[in-house]
A protein has these predicted regions:
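CheY-like receiver
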Residues: 121-152
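Receiver (REC) domain active-site loop signature in two-component systems and cognate sites
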Residues: 56
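C-terminal output helix
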Residues: 107-117, 128
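Active-site beta3 strand of CheY-like receiver
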Residues: 45-51
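Short, glycine/charged-rich "phosphate-handling" switch motifs in NTP-dependent
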Residues: 100
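Charged docking surfaces used in two-component/phosphorelay signaling
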Residues: 16-24
Length: 152
């Protein structure tokens, strides 16, 4: 049975690109363009993975992730962010609040396929969580050094 991936982005071109990248590899790709639809679709379809944009109108990806985490029907679905914002603080916040991965746009199709394959593999996902914890510590150190430097 093919794995189902819910892709949430307000940019139609990103939705088309992700679908064109993943469907040929056998994934069932469901696309929606807003946060409310993402939540209702996740409850009904129970995808194996959610790829979630952060900057969307009405309800941003962070709020969507929080609502998914609060619902017993969706709290265990892994969420990876797709974002054009590569800001350290935003990545750190996403990781701290439960995002399993943070994929920056633009991305190469082969990189997205590899991220998805890793995220759908339970052993690799656990390894990614450990790496994320290490990375969060390093990012915190970098951000703190930058703050100290800026304040001088």
């Amino acid at each position: 049975m093919p794995k189902t991936i819910l892709v949430v982005d307000d940019e139609p071109s990103i939705l088309r690109l992700v679908r064109a990248t993943l469907e040929p590899k056998g994934y069932n790709v469901i696309t929606v363009d807003n946060g409310m639809e993402a939540i209702s679709t996740a409850k009904v379809k129970q995808p194996d993975l959610i790829l979630l944009d952060i900057m969307m109108p009405k309800m941003d990806g962070n709020e969507v992730r929080h609502k998914l985490a609060e619902d017993p029907r969706t709290k265990d679905i892994p969420v990876a962010h797709l974002s054009a914002v590569g800001d350290f603080n935003q990545q750190l916040e996403a990781y701290d609040e439960g995002a399993i991965d943070y994929i920056t746009k633009p991305f190469a199709p082969q990189d997205l396929r590899q991220h998805v394959a890793d995220l759908l593999d339970p052993l690799k996902r656990e390894e990614m969580k450990r790496e994320r914890a290490k990375k969060s510590g390093k990012v915190r150190t970098i951000v703190e050094i930058m703050r100290r430097t800026d304040s001088k």
